[in-house]
């Protein structure tokens, strides 16, 4: 029986109690799906109109010329096959991209001069090349100029309408000034705002403000229309004897004290006396009885009201009062009415006056006051006003003003709300416009102002701009779409001009288009956009996290300086969408976030998180994804709510979230429940076991530091994990997964060949070859190396891990090592978080990592002649050339040190004029060495290691040297091996099928020696015929003959395809390289160095506990346990209480218990090897994993599988304790007891130096520690002499510039304080910027003398020059010293 791969898996004991109904989505789905939608390649459905790249073309095309006699239309687009694959692009420093071909149609019209009618004269279609479009690799990255980059998703404010206030900060009175802003996806912003006097203003694009009524006039409303839109009308009818009768609304008087008696108009009864408060009970009574419909108000009460409509004299059309005018009465000294607009109306016989329903309590007169202040009265003057604000200094005309206003908000080319913006606006203002209505309408603007005025009247709430319903994500596809649109618009202008200037009848679309601007826009985006980042490739986790990052910075986003506290803070809507823990420390805190584990981005760009549906108090397995806005309507319980067997809530009151508040709610009101406790946090945070026991600040550091862990020489999965290590290793692409099920056919360190057994399609050879990446350099100079996990003959299922990558162990993420730690001080060496380590750690390469540096040298064609890469270097001894081959390039495997030559290179130098004698000697001896200088590539100071790879690139047509040819031969051999393997498997597959087809059939005729009508048997096939002759057998059955024919055709076609692919690859290898201009040849050398753990290296746990190694102590001096085991690390116990990351202690205890259980299994295996009895092994496994797991998976294993599974866990039984649902204190105690340890988790330790027992028990256990990418080797640096700054002549600073130590202002004070005059003088002159002095010092040191003289420092000369720059001539005079 072929042994399956399952037995090799390491079993983890899972401590989670909550059943998860939903698998975690693919971790890099955000990137992949977004870019697939943009390009519409791969499995994405065919392009819909208006989406992706097709939508971009459709928004720019058709392009008409200025006379509209011709049109260029977009028909379709297609991406061709990329020229180079991912690996080739990375090796050649190229961009992984595919050529984009666009089909365009040029239509030329004939225009009738008399009628102006158009008729089609000519139509031409053509495919036009539009530049290269970068493709995404299967891991969600882009290869740009040979380096892997990630496009980070951006969080920005969603388009739509937002209401806000200034929090009382603008005006000294602290009054809230409300504002409203309409933000489009692209186009002009429109703001409406109140000022301190309660006048409403509008601003376009943050320019000068205008009264809002000006904008409404420009939209075509008149005064009456405006008043009608914003106010209800109330009629005042005059009853001669009693006063005015007006409608009565009881709600409006609730809580007020009327200034006059409220009198029922029908009965004359007083409902409420003046000055008495109207109670809510009285109002309810009035509403219930419903018999009071009209009030009688005093005659004077109408004064101060505003007229709702123009009141006109019917006979002559004269206006008595205009809409919005205030009603007035004028009295004489005796109190008699002598004038005013009310008297005028009454005199004209008008007793029914419509007034605006403004009571200054529920409805304020803001719009009416604004209108009164506005000097404009008509559309024309309003448009002119807007034009003056938008185009100051230009003389306005009505036509120009009208055209400008239309293009601002109503032209789809200039203004786009986007579908999101329209949906948000419809929801906020309760409108019902179609999604496709992407520009503003008159109704939208009117509704916005109405909502703003209602806010001022105290109705409704302002929006919270940090709510995730108001922030959306722009992923790769959308960012790219916007960038491409910019490029096409630049191109559009050029096309229009060209269409008008050329003879349009004779040109093809190709002649009109210059694709450079579009290609440049794409290149600029990938090369230099703030969101296109160099991928963080330290380890697989850092890759995944980088792809899931959400940044609020970048073009169109925030800037660090302007972002306040609110934007950075955690918001209730982040729950399950963005991680509240993982964010950088420092100026970017809260602006750069990480997507939560289960979150996804919907088609509108809002982040959604999944919930299980609760129906009638029962939790179902139905899962709904909800955006933050949808979630506000629901009551959501937490995943850890207690449920019984029927999935019903046990408790009557359940802890829930309701519209941003955390409350206890009755269980029947709950309608959703979280799918998992870890949906709250990001991937990095969910890798921290016992996260629930850590302080949030430390958890933040823990999440961030896991991303800096360096891949070690031998990866080791954590004993105490959380169960998602496997998912991260799988989705990051670090480990290799089988694409389809099959049998392992061949295997070596470089590749795995699998014979596929499923998903076979017609014409498919059924061979999968997986090439492993061997010792490749990552972006962070760490080492990418993959190792096979499988053996020949094993069967693998689709999606199984067949090879481990960097920082993965048996398909699980493994960032560090499990080591024995003791929390105890040791002679002060763990003061301030320092770490003491045992020599065993350094000796056994426990924390050793490999780092690969890349060195590059180019031979250019200079003005004086070409540079040359050669072994023949002037004035260099044979010793220095020992590592170079005959071509002058270092050989692979050479150990190199600082100063060693890697590639020999000579550069011609300028000829100095020669004397005739020199010319003669030159002619006789052919001496050439003098006119070249040595510019070889040497190893930098502080670098050392082993050469692991050399690549040579030659320009087209340049002759290749021996080394380049050798590399080429090796590459071709490798390709040939792949082809031969594929052919071999193809042959075996085809001939096996052919054999099954032929056996037992009758052959009518065949090759020589086969008689007619022979029954085909095994002897005939194996002994009489060669395999090639099998095809010549003609079968009796017509159907069989057809199958044979089809099989033969398929075989030949596959062989041809294989050969063509091989030829294509070989041609690419042999073809010259595209090098930058002027470069003839380029050599890259890769040097690998092993970095052992040493003092000064930074280490950390997963709980934010970090420290620097202070000392390496011999193993025999370390504290040891009673059985003689020395501990590996001593950590400071004082680092725990104040930091409140107790999770590390629980992890230490749990790891200790896991190690103990592993040792028990090891003992059982020893017994088995002695006695052959499996029972102790089964018992030990049952005890370690518990009855459930044992019955489910282990009891059914056969002997080999069980021994293999047990052998995998002898160093400790791996456990998984998921975040917020992991092992509790009782579980830790129970595990310690089962492992045979004390419940306290503490052990007696002995001092390694004296052998004495320590005074009290010490916490000892297994802890997972990481070595971080802050290595002392990269930081330590020394300089004797080196480069100087040009102006000040002082040494440069920093390791990268090979700089010196800064002796700054404060250090000078220190020497001054000690009176160390001579030392100070040296520091400020000869050791710094006294140019003449330092040269003399150097010379005197060489001669062995010890006297020197300090001169004038160069910085003093700089000061003199600056003073002269101010116009003051300052000179240094050499005064003769008088005795």
Swiss-Prot record:
| Example of a GO MF term | DNA-directed RNA polymerase activity
Q: Could you tell me which InterPro entries the record lists for this protein? A: DNA-dir_RNA_pol_bsu_ext_1_sf, DNA-dir_RNA_pol_bsu_external_1, DNA-dir_RNA_pol_su2, DNA-dir_RNAP_su2_dom, DNA-dir_RNAP_su2_hyb_sf, RNA_pol_bsu_bac, RNA_pol_bsu_CS, RNA_pol_bsu_protrusion
The entry's keywords:
DNA-directed RNA polymerase, Nucleotidyltransferase, Transcription, Transferase
**GO terms classed as biological process:** DNA-templated transcription
The reaction(s) catalysed by this protein are:
RNA(n) + a ribonucleoside 5'-triphosphate = RNA(n+1) + diphosphate
Please tell me which top-level EC class this enzyme sits in: transferase
Its quaternary structure? Answer: The RNAP catalytic core consists of 2 alpha, 1 beta, 1 beta' and 1 omega subunit. When a sigma factor is associated with the core the holoenzyme is formed, which can initiate transcription.
Which purpose does this protein serve, as stated in its record? DNA-dependent RNA polymerase catalyzes the transcription of DNA into RNA using the four ribonucleoside triphosphates as substrates.
Q: What is this protein called?
A: DNA-directed RNA polymerase subunit beta
């Amino acid at each position: 029986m072929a042994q399956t791969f399952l037995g090799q898996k390491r079993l983890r004991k899972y401590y989670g109690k909550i059943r998860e109904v939903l698998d975690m989505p693919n971790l890099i789905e955000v990137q992949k799906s977004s870019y697939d939608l943009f390009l519409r390649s791969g499995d994405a459905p065919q392009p819909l109109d208006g989406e992706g790249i097709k939508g971009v073309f459709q928004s720019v095309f058709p392009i008409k010329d200025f006379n509209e006699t011709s049109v260029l239309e977009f028909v379709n687009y297609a991406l061709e096959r990329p020229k180079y694959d991912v690996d080739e692009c990375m090796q050649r420093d190229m961009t992984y991209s595919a050529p984009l071909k666009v089909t365009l149609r040029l239509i030329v019209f004939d225009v009738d001069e008399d009628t102006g009618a158009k008729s089609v004269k000519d139509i031409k279609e053509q495919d036009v090349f539009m530049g290269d479009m970068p493709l995404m690799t299967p891991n969600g990255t882009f290869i740009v100029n040979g380096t892997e980059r990630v496009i980070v998703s951006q969080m920005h404010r969603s388009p739509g309408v937002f209401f806000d206030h200034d929090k009382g900060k603008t005006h000294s009175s602290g009054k809230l000034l409300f504002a409203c802003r309409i933000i489009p996806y692209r186009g002009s912003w429109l703001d409406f705002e109140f000022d301190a006097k309660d006048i409403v203003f509008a601003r376009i694009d943050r320019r000068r403000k205008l009264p809002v009524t000006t904008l409404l006039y420009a939209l075509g409303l008149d005064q009456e229309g405006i008043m009608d839109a914003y106010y209800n009308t109330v009629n005042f009818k005059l009853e001669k004897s009693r006063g005015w009768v007006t409608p009565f609304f009881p709600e409006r008087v609730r809580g007020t004290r009327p200034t006059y008696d409220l009198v029922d108009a029908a009965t004359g009864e007083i409902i409420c006396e003046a000055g008495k408060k109207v109670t809510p009970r009285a109002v309810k009574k009035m509403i219930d009885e419903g018999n009071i419909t009209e009030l009688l108000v005093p005659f004077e009460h109408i004064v101060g009201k505003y007229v709702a409509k123009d009141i006109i004299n019917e006979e002559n059309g004269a206006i008595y009062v205009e809409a919005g005018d205030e009603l007035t009465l004028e009295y004489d000294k005796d109190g008699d009415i002598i004038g005013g607009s009310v008297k005028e109306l009454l005199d004209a016989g008008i007793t029914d006056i419509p007034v605006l329903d403004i009571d200054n309590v529920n409805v304020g007169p803001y719009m009416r006051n604004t209108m009164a202040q506005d000097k404009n009265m008509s559309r024309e003057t309003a448009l002119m006003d807007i034009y003056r604000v938008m185009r100051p200094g230009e003389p306005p005309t009505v036509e120009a003003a009208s055209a400008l206003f239309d293009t601002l908000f109503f032209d789809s080319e200039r203004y786009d709300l986007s579908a999101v913006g329209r949906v948000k606006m419809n929801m906020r203002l309760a409108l019902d416009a179609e999604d496709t209505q992407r520009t503003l309408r008159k109704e939208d603007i009117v509704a916005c102002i109405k909502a703003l005025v209602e806010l001022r009247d105290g109705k409704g709430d302002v929006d919270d701009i940090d709510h995730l319903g108001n922030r959306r994500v722009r992923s790769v596809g959308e960012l790219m779409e916007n960038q491409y649109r910019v490029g096409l618009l630049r191109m559009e202008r050029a096309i229009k001009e060209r269409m008008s200037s050329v003879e349009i009848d004779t040109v093809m679309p190709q002649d009109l288009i210059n694709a450079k601007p579009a290609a440049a826009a794409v290149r600029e985006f990938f090369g230099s956009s703030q969101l296109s980042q160099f991928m963080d490739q330290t380890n697989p986790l850092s890759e995944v996290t980088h792809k899931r990052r959400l940044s609020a910075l970048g073009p169109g986003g925030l800037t660090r300086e302007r972002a306040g506290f609110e934007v950075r803070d955690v918001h209730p809507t982040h729950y399950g969408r963005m991680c509240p823990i993982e964010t950088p420390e420092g100026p970017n805190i809260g602006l750069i976030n990480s997507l939560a584990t289960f979150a996804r981005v919907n088609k509108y760009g809002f982040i959604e998180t999944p919930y299980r549906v609760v129906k009638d108090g029962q939790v179902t397995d139905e899962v709904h994804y909800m955006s933050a806005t949808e979630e506000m309507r629901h009551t959501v319980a937490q995943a850890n709510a207690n449920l019984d067997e029927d999935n019903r809530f046990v408790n009557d009151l359940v802890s829930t979230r309701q519209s941003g508040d955390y409350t206890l709610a009755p269980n029947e009101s709950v309608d959703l429940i979280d799918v998992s406790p870890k949906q709250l946090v990001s991937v990095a945070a969910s890798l921290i076991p016992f996260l629930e026991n850590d302080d949030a600040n430390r958890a933040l550091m823990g999440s961030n530091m896991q991303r800096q862990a360096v891949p070690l020489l031998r990866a080791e999965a954590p004993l105490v994990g959380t169960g998602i290590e496997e998912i991260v290793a799988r989705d990051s692409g670090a480990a290799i997964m089988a694409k389809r099920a099959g049998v392992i056919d061949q295997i070596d360190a470089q590749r795995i060949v699998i014979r596929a057994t499923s998903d076979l399609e017609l014409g498919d050879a059924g061979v999968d070859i997986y090439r492993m990446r061997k010792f490749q350099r990552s972006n962070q100079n760490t080492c990418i190396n993959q190792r096979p996990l499988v053996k020949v003959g094993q069967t693998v299922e689709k999606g199984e891990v067949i090879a481990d990558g960097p920082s993965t162990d048996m398909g699980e993420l493994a960032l560090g090592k499990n080591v024995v730690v003791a929390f105890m001080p040791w002679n002060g060496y763990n003061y301030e978080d320092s770490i003491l380590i045992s020599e065993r750690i350094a000796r056994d390469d426990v924390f050793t990592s490999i780092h690969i540096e890349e060195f590059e040298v180019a031979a250019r064609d200079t003005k004086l002649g070409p540079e040359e890469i050669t072994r023949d270097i002037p004035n260099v001894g044979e010793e220095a050339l020992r590592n170079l081959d005959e071509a002058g390039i270092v050989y692979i495997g050479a150990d190199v040190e600082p100063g060693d030559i890697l590639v020999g290179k000579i550069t011609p130098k300028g000829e100095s004029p020669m004397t005739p004698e020199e010319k003669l000697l030159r002619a006789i001896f052919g001496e050439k060495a003098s006119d070249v200088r040595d510019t070889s590539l040497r190893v930098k100071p502080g670098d050392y290691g082993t050469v692991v790879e050399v690549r040579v690139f030659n320009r087209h047509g340049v002759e290749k040297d021996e080394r380049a040819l050798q590399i080429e031969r090796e590459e071709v051999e490798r390709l040939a091996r792949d082809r031969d393997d594929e052919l071999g498997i193809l042959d075996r597959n085809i001939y096996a099928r052919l054999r099954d087809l032929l056996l037992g059939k009758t052959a009518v005729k065949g090759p020589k020696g086969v008689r007619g009508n022979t029954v085909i048997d095994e002897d005939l096939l194996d002994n009489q015929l060669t395999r090639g002759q099998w095809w010549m057998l003609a079968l009796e059955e017509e159907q069989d003959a057809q199958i044979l024919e089809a099989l033969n055709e398929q075989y030949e076609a596959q062989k041809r395809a294989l050969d063509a692919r091989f030829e294509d690859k070989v041609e690419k290898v042999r073809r010259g390289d595209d090098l930058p201009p002027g470069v003839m040849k380029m050599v890259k050398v890769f040097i690998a160095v092993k970095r052992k753990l040493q003092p000064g290296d930074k280490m950390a746990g997963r709980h934010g506990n970090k420290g620097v190694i202070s000392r390496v102590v011999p193993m025999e001096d370390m504290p040891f346990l009673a059985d003689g085991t020395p501990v590996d690390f001593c950590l400071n116990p004082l680092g725990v209480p104040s930091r409140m990351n107790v999770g590390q202690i629980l992890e230490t205890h749990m790891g200790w218990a896991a190690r103990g259980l592993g040792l028990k299994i090891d003992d059982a295996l020893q017994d088995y090897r002695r006695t052959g009895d499996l029972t102790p092994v089964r018992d030990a496994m049952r005890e370690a994993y518990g009855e459930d797991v044992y019955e489910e998976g282990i009891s059914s294993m056969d002997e080999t599988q069980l021994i293999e599974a047990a052998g995998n866990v002898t160093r400790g039984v791996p456990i998984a304790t998921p975040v917020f649902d992991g092992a509790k204190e009782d579980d830790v105690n129970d595990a310690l007891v089962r492992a045979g340890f004390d419940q306290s988790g503490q052990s007696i330790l002995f001092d390694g130096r004296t052998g004495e027992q320590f005074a009290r028990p010490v916490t000892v256990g297994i802890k997972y520690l990481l070595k971080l990418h802050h290595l002392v080797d990269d930081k330590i640096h020394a300089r004797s002499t080196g480069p100087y700054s040009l102006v000040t002549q002082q040494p440069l600073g920093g390791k990268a510039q090979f700089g010196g130590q800064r002796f700054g202002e404060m250090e000078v004070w220190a020497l001054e304080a000690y009176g160390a005059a001579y030392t100070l003088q040296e520091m400020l002159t000869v050791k710094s910027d006294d140019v003449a002095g330092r040269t003399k010092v150097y010379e005197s040191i060489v001669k062995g003398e010890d006297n020197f003289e300090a001169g004038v420092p160069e910085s003093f000369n700089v000061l003199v020059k600056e003073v002269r720059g101010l116009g003051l001539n300052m000179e240094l005079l050499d005064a003769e010293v008088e005795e």
